[in-house]
UniProtKB/Swiss-Prot annotation:
Gene responsible for this protein: rsmG
CDD domains assigned to the protein according to its UniProt record, in alphabetical order: AdoMet_MTases
HAMAP family xref list: 16SrRNA_methyltr_G
Protein name: Ribosomal RNA small subunit methyltransferase G
One example GO MF annotation: rRNA (guanine-N7-)-methyltransferase activity
Length: 237
């Protein structure tokens, strides 16, 4: 997917980018490739592949109407090189984006990226989701949480749901069918007072299968969740 094909696909979906936004995506690509030589940010480095499998894939929830262009607080867990939240922020500048990542070098890249792109309303924190999820500054403070290929839903729900306001939504992006995952996560979602609202397959323009799962927080998360760092992975709910 060339940059031009990416812009056209967005335009056909009703989202025509400004020249400034196009320049932001171009700068993002160049910085990603430059920094990838120093630290491992992505295995995908060819321009057309980055635009398809990182940029387009990241903004798919916007194209499908899951996120409005409003000043909502969005938290991205384990964003790595900024996916999906930074492409979302470029497209929808009103979003207030927070990223938590466990590798400090990635946070340094994101800080530089935000500066070079001229992004405002972006915040980066180094650490584990389990620790931040018990911090009053973060717990129950977000309208949306995004996670792209982070963990199975059984684990992911414990890492993300505590951050949401009541009626806030988790948007999980996956490359494999999550039907089995959702079945395994039933108990976890019940314990966390969350409910699956939607689970939709879609295709990237090249035909690759992807899945979006939308989960809503119904009540306050019990205080014991999330458990200490590492436990959700070792002993899923």
């Amino acid at each position: 997917m060339t940059p031009q094909a990416f812009y056209l696909a967005l335009e056909q979906a009703g989202f025509a980018l400004t020249n400034h936004q196009k320049e932001q995506f171009d700068t993002y690509f160049k910085l990603l490739i430059d920094w990838n030589r120093k630290i491992n940010l992505t295995a995908i480095t060819e321009e057309n592949e980055v635009y398809l499998k990182h940029f387009y894939d990241s903004v798919a929830p916007l194209l499908q109407g899951y996120i409005p262009n409003e000043p909502l607080r969005l938290l991205d867990i384990g964003a790595g090189a900024g996916f999906p939240s930074i492409p979302m922020k470029i497209m929808f500048p009103k979003l207030d984006v927070t990223i938590i990542d466990s590798l400090n070098k990635r946070i340094q890249f994101l800080q530089l990226l935000a500066k070079e792109l001229g992004l405002e309303g972006v915040h980066f924190y180094h650490g584990r989701a389990e620790d931040f999820g018990q911090d009053k500054q973060f717990r129950g403070q977000f309208d949306l949480v995004t996670a792209r290929a982070v963990a199975r839903m059984q684990i992911l729900s414990e890492l993300t749901i505590p951050f949401l306001k009541i009626k806030g939504k988790l948007i999980a992006l996956k490359a494999q069918a999550a039907d089995q995952e959702l079945e395994e996560a039933k108990k976890a979602l019940q314990l966390l007072f969350a409910k699956v609202l939607d689970h939709q397959p879609y295709q990237l323009p090249n035909g690759d299968a992807r899945y979006i799962t939308l989960v809503e927080k119904k009540k306050e998360t019990p205080n014991k969740y999330p458990r200490k760092a590492g436990i959700p992975n070792k002993k899923p709910l």
